[in-house]
Regions:
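Alpha-helical elements of Rossmann-like donor-binding domains used by nucleotide-donor carbohydrate transfer enzymes
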Residues: 8, 47, 51, 83-90
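Small/polar loops that bind or transfer phosphate-bearing groups
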Residues: 14, 40, 104
Length: 105
């Protein structure tokens, strides 16, 4: 059985001494870069609608993550958009990805 938003395991990746929680599932063989989701300020992975993320995961790989210091990630929460963007880029690189399409609101 394929993973879904609710069944994909929450994994941890360490970046600069802090632990970032993320979930990754979906169609990794689509030939397209993964969709990397950025949640609203201090929101967590579970704030996304599973109907939407699972619908998108049918055609693309989906990656959700918790910002530094939010939900299941450790560290001090960032207060500047620039710092949050830097963290997202570092997590993307730590996951071994050179390209993603970003989804956010």
């Amino acid at each position: 059985m394929a993973d879904t938003h609710l069944t994909a395991p929450t994994r941890i990746i360490e970046v600069e001494g802090d632990r970032f929680a993320y979930r990754r599932w979906g169609n990794s063989g689509s030939g397209q870069p993964p969709l990397f989701f950025l949640q609203h300020f201090r929101g967590g992975m579970d704030h996304w609608d599973p109907l939407m993320t699972d619908g998108l995961a049918a055609g693309r790989e989906v990656i959700l993550y918790d910002y530094r210091g939010c939900a299941s990630s450790t560290g001090v929460p960032r207060t500047l958009i620039e710092d949050m963007a830097d963290d997202a880029a570092k997590v993307i690189r730590a996951l071994g990805l050179s390209r993603v399409d970003v989804v956010g609101f």
